[in-house]
Amino acid sequence: VGSEMCIRDSACNLLGLEEQVLDEKKSQIAHGETVRETANMVSFMADVIGIRDDMFIGEGHKYQKTFMDALEEGYRDGILEQRPTLVNLQCDVDHPTQCMADMLHIIHYFGGVENLKGKKVAMTWAYSPSYGKPLSVPQGVIGLFTRFGMDVTLAHPEGYEVMPEVEEIAKKNAAATGGSFKKCNDMKEAFKDADIVYPKSWAPFKAMEERTKLYQAGDKDGIDALEKKLLAQNAEHKDWACTEEMMKLTKDGKALYLHCLPADITGLSCPEGEVDNSVFDRYIVPLYKQASYKPYIIAAMMFLAQVKDPVRALMEMDKSGEERKMF
C-alpha cells in the first residue's frame, strides 16, 4: 500500500535508518524457503524488521512468533551478531501501530490521558462494498482502549463477530481499569451519547477462518463462492453507515470520528459506503492529524527497543538544540 510504505519510510528517516523492502513474491519464500531461513537471511545486518501479515486468520500472528523464535535461535547459536527488533506492522489479531496512533490522537484531542476515563467509545462495523477487510483494527481498538478506563461498545450485525480471545482481553482490561466493555447488534445504541465513534468495515471472523482453510487447500471455486456469499451478506446491512443522522445521536452531536483510512466514502469513493461524504469532509483535519501520529509511533517502537536508556538519549538530543535541516 503506497501510503503505508510512505509512513514506514518516514519513521525510518526520522531515525536515520535505511529501509529495504522484501517482497515475498519476488524472494525465495515463493520457492519454498522456510521461516527459519528467511528470518536468519534477512537479519545478518538488520537492526529492525517490520512484518505486515494480516490477511489470513490464524496465520499472521503465528508467523511473527515463529519468525521471532527463529531469530532467538539464530542469535543463541551465534549465527546472528545481534537480534533485530521485530515491529508488528499489522497481523490478523492486532494492528498495534495504528491503534497506538489512534490512542495518541485522542490523548491530544481530550487534553491528556487522565481525561480518557469514562469516555464512551463506539467501535462499530460499517457497510463496505468489499468483503475482506481485516479484523485487526477493531480488535486492536477494543484491546487497547479498555486499558484506559474507557467505556467501549463493540457493535456489529449478527454474524460479524471478532476473535473471542480478543473480546476476553477487552473484558479483563475493562474490569482492571474501571471502564466497561459491552457488545450489541445496534449501531444507534452504540452511537448514542458516544464521545468517540470508529465506524469501520471488517469481515466475519468465522468466514475468515473458512477462507484461510480454502486458500490452504487451493480451492479457488470455494473461495469464489465464499466471496459471493459475503458480498451478499454485506449488502443486507447498508444501513450500517456513519450518516449525519447517526452523528446527531452522539454526545452533543459532536463525537470525534476516527478511521484508519482509506474509508469507503458514500458518494465519493463508492455509491454506498462506511461514511457520508459530508461527515468525512467535516472531520478531514482531525483525520489527517490521527494519521500523522503513525510514523512517530513506529519510530518510537524502534527507538525504545534499540536504545538502552531512551529517556537519557532524548534529553541529550533536546539539550543539543539541533533542528531538522531543510534543504
Feature-to-residue mapping (PLM):
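Adenosine-phosphate binding glycine-rich loop
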Residues: 250-327
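Short, small-residue-biased leader/transition segments that mark boundaries at the very start
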Residues: 1-7
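Rossmann-like adenosine-cofactor binding region
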Residues: 172-276
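Short, conserved loop/helix-junction motifs that constitute active-site signature segments
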Residues: 115-117, 146, 245-254, 282
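Phosphate/diphosphate ligand-binding glycine-rich loop within oxidoreductases
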Residues: 8-107
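Short internal alpha-helix immediately C-terminal to a glycine-rich phosphate-binding loop
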Residues: 98-124
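Conserved anion/nucleotide-ligand pocket segment
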Residues: 121-156
